[in-house]
Each structure stands twice: as structure tokens, then as C-alpha cells.
């Protein structure tokens, strides 16, 4: 036997085997699915909490003429209020909307009111509160003013919800003898004792307040023990607002 030839053949066979072994592709290692702990949670939407809502019936000359609704929500450290006010006067609609934003203690940060506050009268005003100043809008005109130490945003007797919030603010901020109002004016809020009224066969006691400065004359408001406005009377306008 020719051993030299056999060795050469063996070398060729081994070389071929090695080449075939190293030519085999590596198997793909399956990727491990991320666990629930390693998966990033989607960002959560801001939590908006519904705090309060209510409805008032509007009366003029002791006749039902419309209604006012409001909703208060909390978003973090802020409160937002949306108000719809609408009544009918001599066959014509008188719609009014207002939005209000504040800190949780009712310190105002923004206010806007737009629509009709009487059959022949319109309003379009806004207030934006900054750290040291306030921006006031009357229709298309903006002006700046110094920020008062204590104040509330309101523009007239309507909507009644804003009067309710103003009394709450006043009562929780030292009950000042006078309170500045924006976009303009000052009001005087005074407690006037309590009245007991029969409601659904039982007696209920309400706190009575008066407000001067929003409209000619003096308004009277009644609140329950939870600081909810129950009734508002505006004698100069012959208007009464009653919670439903």
C-alpha cells in the first residue's frame, strides 16, 4: 500500500470535514420576552376628579324663565368650573357662559364670561392672573393692572355660581370687610344671621348673607351647612335663583 498517497487523501478528507463544520451557521438564540417588570408602563392620563355639579332655576317676576348649570372638576392642584346660564326674555334667548380656574383654595387664576347678561346687553370679558399682575380683556382690548392682595373674579350678578364661589372664597380667606373684584369693582359681603324654612315637611336652617357692589342695590343669598347656594334674590332686577 502507498502510505504517502493514503496520508494525502486523509489530509484532504479531514480538511473537507473541518470546512463543512465551520460552514454550518450558528442557530439563532431566541430573545427572551421582556417581563412585566421590565416593560415600561404607558404614561397615565391626568386624573380629573368631578368635585361638584348643580342646577339652578331662574325666575323673574316670580315666573320661571330659564336655568343655570355648573360643574366643578379638580385636576391636580387646580379647580375648573364650567357654567351655562340661559333664560328667555320676551321670546328671545339670553345665553351666557363662564369658565373659572383657581387653586384648590379658590384663589383665581383665570376667568372668562361671554354672552348676554340681559336681553339687549352683551358681555365678553376675561381675566388672566399672573404672579404680580393681572391681564384684563374687554372684548378685543387687553390691559394690565397690579394684582390685588386679595380678590375674586366676577362680572355682575350672573351667573349665580360665581357668587356662590365668591362667598366661599371670602369665608375661607378671613372674611374681609371689602373684597376687590376683577375685572373691576369691589364688593361688601355681610353675614345676616340664619333663617329656618320648612322644606318637604321638615325645618331646615340656612345662613343668610348680603352682597353689595355687583349690581345696584343689595342682593340676598342663602347657603346650607355645606356652603351650597340655595337661593339668590336680586331685587333691583326682580330676579330669583333657586337651587333645584
What are these language model-derived features?
Residues 23-36:
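Signal peptide processing junction and immediate N-terminal pro/mature segment
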